[in-house]
Amino acid sequence: LVGSEMCIRDRYINIYGRSYLSDGKLKLDHTTNGVDLFFKGETLSVTLKASANSYMRVFIDDDTEGRRLAVSIGTKSYVVAQGLEAGNHKIRIVKITEMQDATWEVQSFSAEGFFAAPAKSELKLEFIGDSITAGYGVLGKQSDQKTIMNSDASKTYAYLTAQKMNADYSVIAWSGICTKAPLWGPGM
């Protein structure tokens, strides 16, 4: 168990997706990048810097649906779990907005205490794709224009497959840019 304020350390979090550490901060650019944390207490906060308004999905303990939480441009602290029973908890925070819409810099976490994360799955999956893989408009109607409000990468086949298989995963996806014939610009 470590103290109540935690900087980013691999030992205490499982990091998902292609991301990197820079000056003690975790850069989460791609859709479905995220972290698992194991903490003690009733409340957990995360401080992050977002390049634009975006969304996260927060899964607590064995919850599979999660809660959608809006993220505002700039640096802000977000209470991602509160009112939990006193004790040990697992939380997963997933960036569900596409890379071209927003990037994040996770700066710290705050709780009563943190525990070392268990080993990640030996099964590793990587998904490369376009809008279907990125969750483009997945919450909207077929006639709706894509927005960050109706897009959610945690509802895609890539994310759901990785969860069902209990796999470590990475998603490289960008709406409109596919591996063979992009709608605009160069392909992957």
What are the functions of these language-model segments?
Residues 1-8:
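Short, small-residue-biased leader/transition segments that mark boundaries at the very start
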Residues 20-39:
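Short beta-strands within extracellular/lumenal beta-sheet-rich domains
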Residues 32, 99, 138-188:
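Conserved SGNH/GDSL esterase-like catalytic core that processes O-acyl groups on lipids
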Residues 44-46, 75-105:
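Short, well-structured beta-strand segments within conserved domains
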Residues 124-128, 133, 169-173:
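Structural recognition of the beta-strand scaffold that forms the well-ordered cores
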